[in-house]
């Protein structure tokens, strides 16, 4: 798999790159924190297929996993390493190993579609879970499940494929911070600028790595153009 090029910051106006739909207008609320948009032709191609309404659930799951692999590689670019020595068949040479344990926390249920990618790249990763439900009238989330490992001195990867209003992502981050997390990176497939702005306002230290910042939200708080309900398409519960 080709290594991803450095991601772009979402602090400046975004352009359409490699077929990926990103924000090209001035939204009412623009992200102001640390947000990186993955800039890779494979990511753009995978995202295009995920957006396609005719993509069936089995293929959707495969595409989501592949895109999550790229997102995870970018999200862990700055994980600290430590020097070590390794013996090759010919000699001894220097290398590195990860110096900070990783924890993956998918937001149920949609985040499960990104989890396998993380566990394949990092088999030693510890996994926690956060369950949130959104009230479709107020769009506000409620926490119904939380099972978290120790989070202090660990790099936490929060898996939330589609932060829309930012309420669920903020609630998840709040739960993680209350459990001791101080190094959180949110991985998402598509994001709304309103949601990212709210997340950075309430949790300015959280970094976001996404494949696209879309145009915004419609009157039902759905991301436009988006890709529909990620969890429903992932599990075939349309």
Task: List each model region and its residues.
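PRPP-associated nucleotide enzymes
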Residues: 2-238
């Amino acid at each position: 798999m080709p290594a991803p090029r450095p991601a772009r910051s979402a602090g400046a106006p975004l352009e359409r790159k490699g077929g990926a739909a990103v924000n090209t207008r001035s939204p009412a609320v623009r992200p102001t924190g640390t947000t990186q948009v993955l800039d890779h032709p494979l990511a753009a191609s995978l995202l295009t297929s995920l957006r396609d309404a005719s993509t069936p659930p089995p293929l959707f799951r495969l595409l989501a996993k592949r895109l999550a692999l790229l997102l995870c590689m970018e999200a862990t670019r700055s994980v600290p390493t430590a020097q070590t020595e390794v013996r090759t068949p010919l000699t001894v040479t220097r290398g590195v190993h990860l110096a900070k344990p990783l924890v993956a926390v998918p937001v149920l249920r949609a985040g499960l579609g990104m989890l396998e990618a993380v566990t394949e790249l990092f088999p030693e990763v510890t996994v926690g879970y956060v369950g949130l439900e959104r009230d479709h009238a107020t769009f506000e989330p409620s926490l119904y499940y939380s099972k978290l490992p120790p989070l202090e001195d660990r790099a936490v990867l929060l898996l939330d494929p589609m932060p829309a209003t930012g309420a669920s992502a903020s609630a998840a981050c709040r739960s993680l911070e209350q459990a001791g997390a101080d190094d959180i990176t949110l991985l998402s497939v598509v994001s709304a600028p309103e949601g990212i702005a709210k997340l950075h306002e309430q949790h300015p230290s959280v970094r976001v790595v996404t494949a696209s910042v879309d145009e915004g939200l419609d009157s039902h708080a759905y991301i436009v153009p988006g890709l529909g309900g990620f969890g429903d398409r992932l599990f075939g519960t349309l």
